[in-house]
Amino acid sequence: MKEQYEQIAIQYHSEVLEKETEEILWGIVVDADKNLFQIDNIPFYGPELSCEDIVHAKYDEKAKRYQLVHIEQPSGNTTVQVMVLKEKYNREDLYNEILYAQTEIELVDDYYFVINVPAKTDYKNVYAILAALEEEQVISFAEPNLSPKHNADIRK
C-alpha cells in the first residue's frame, strides 16, 4: 500500500527567527481514524519535534490542512540547527563530514541547515564533529530537541 502524506501546520515562537511563526511539515498517515501521523521531514526552526515523531493533528476546515495538537510518541531522534559562520568554507566538505556520521541534512540556504540524528546513531560522534567546527568558528549550533538517548551518548 502506498504511503499517504498530509501537510501538518505547526505554530510556535521561534528562537532562531525571534518571532511567532508557522512551519508546514509533511506527515505520513499512521492511523487515519485517530489522526496520527509520522513526521517525514526535519523541522527547520521549530519546537521540540523531530523527524519520525508520531504526532496527533486535527483537520482545520478553514485552512484545509492539519494542525499539530501534540506529540503522541517521540521517535528518539534529535534535531540540530546549524548556522554556517564562515563565508568561504567548502559547504560540500562540511555536509559530507556530518552526513558521514550517519545523519540526514535539510538545507534552508548556504548559511542555515538542520540535521536529523536518528535514534540508532551514536550522538557522541556527531557532537564531536559539531563542537570541533564550532570551536574553529566555522559553525554555531543548537539542539532544540536532544533526545534522552543522545544526551546519554555525549556523557559516556
Model-predicted segments: where are they?
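C-terminal effector modules of nucleic-acid-centric enzymes and ribosome-associated factors
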Residues: L85-K156
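Extended boundary segments
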Residues: M1-K19
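Short glycine-/aliphatic-rich beta-strand segments at the starts of folded cytosolic domains
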Residues: E72-K86, F113
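Short, Lys/Arg- and Gly-enriched loop/turn segments at beta-strand edges
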Residues: D60-E72
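Short, structured beta-strand/loop micro-motifs enriched in basic residues and often containing a Trp
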Residues: D31-N41
